[in-house]
Structure formats: structure tokens, C-alpha cells
A protein has these predicted regions:
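Active-site-adjacent beta->alpha loops and helix N-cap segments on the catalytic face
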Residues: 65-72, 120-145
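Glycine-rich, positively charged N-terminal anion/phosphate-binding segment
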Residues: 9, 13-19, 34-107
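Extreme N-terminal starter segment of soluble prokaryotic enzymes
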Residues: 27-29
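N-terminal amphipathic/basic-hydrophobic helices that include classical n-h-c signal peptides
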Residues: 1-11
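A structural preference for short, pocket-lining loop segments at secondary-structure junctions
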Residues: 105, 112-113, 124-125, 129
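Alpha-helix-loop-beta-strand connector modules within alpha/beta enzyme cores
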Residues: 76-84, 132-154
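Structured C-terminal cap/extension of enzyme domains
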Residues: 4, 16-25
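Non-cysteine beta-strand/loop elements that form the S-adenosyl-L-methionine
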Residues: 57, 110-119
């Protein structure tokens, strides 16, 4: 399988075709996002062991990324060896998602994963995570807003 590096990713004709490119090479091997675990040092270890792995970050708040330079630095600073790197974000406000997506793209991240699966009560109670599976219109507006805001895959 071809390893996607910042160079190969940046020379792709359409960054939104990232997943298609990977699928052509064979099965996609991915490290799922895990809150409290998939930080940069952990992702770097995984990439040393299995360079073909697509790694995901812990999940970060779209609102938090939009408003906090400190969170942006913590969440989005990464080692070039982590490519391809997908940042997972959560929230419920399409505008916040679009703004966070622009920030994420500005850091040279490969793509964005919208958290629609977290079943934690405190996450669901606030309208985030798996609650978006029920609030399909909100989920649609989130994806739509992000798709118009950035060129990277969502």
C-alpha cells in the first residue's frame, strides 16, 4: 500500500478523493479515534509500527477549536510522520463546524471525521455524538457547511 505523505497528499488533484486513493491500494487500515489515547505521541508510535495506518485524533469540540488558540495548538500540532491524519470533531452548530474545519485545514491535516457515534450520556445529552444520528437535519447542515468551507475530505 502506498503511504500517503504530506507531499503526495498535497499533489493530489482532488483532496476529497483521499479515501478512493487509499481503497485502490487494498484494505484501509485505520486507528479509530479514542478519547484520552490517540494523541500525537501515540499516533507516532502506531505509524512507526504500521506506516500504512490512517490515524485519527481524539475528539475535539468544534466550538473549542473555533475559540481557543490553546486548544488548536494542542489538538492540531502534529508530526509529519502521522500522515494520513484525520481529526475528529464533535458539536452541533454547523457554523462552528465550518469554522473549525477551516482551522483544521490550515494546519495541513488530511481530513475531518464528524463524531456521530459517541454514546456517552453527557455527550448525547448536549446534542452531540450519537444524538446527531437522530437529528439528521442538523447532521446534514453540519456536513454541508463543512463541505462548502474546505477542500479536505470530511
Amino acid at each position: 500500500m502506498q503511504t500517503v505523505t504530506p507531499h503526495t497528499y498535497n499533489t493530489m488533484t482532488s483532496k476529497k478523493d483521499f479515501w478512493k486513493l487509499l481503497a485502490q491500494k487494498g484494505p484501509i487500515v485505520a486507528l479509530a479515534p479514542m478519547d484520552g489515547y490517540t494523541d500525537s505521541p501515540y499516533r507516532q508510535i502506531v505509524k512507526k509500527i504500521a506506516p500504512e495506518t490512517v490515524v485519527f485524533s481524539e475528539f475535539y469540540s468544534a466550538d473549542g477549536l473555533m475559540h481557543s488558540k490553546e486548544l488548536q495548538k494542542k489538538a492540531l500540532t502534529h508530526d509529519p510522520n502521522e500522515y494520513p491524519l484525520i481529526i475528529q470533531i464533535f458539536g452541533k452548530d454547523p457554523h462552528a463546524f465550518a469554522e473549525a474545519a477551516k482551522i483544521i485545514e490550515g494546519y495541513g491535516i488530511t481530513g475531518i471525521d464528524v463524531n456521530m457515534g459517541c454514546p456517552a450520556k453527557k455527550v448525547v445529552k448536549s446534542g452531540h455524538g450519537s444524538s446527531l444520528m437522530i437529528e439528521r437535519e442538523t447532521a446534514f447542515h453540519i456536513i454541508e457547511a463543512m463541505s462548502h468551507a474546505v477542500q479536505i475530505p470530511i
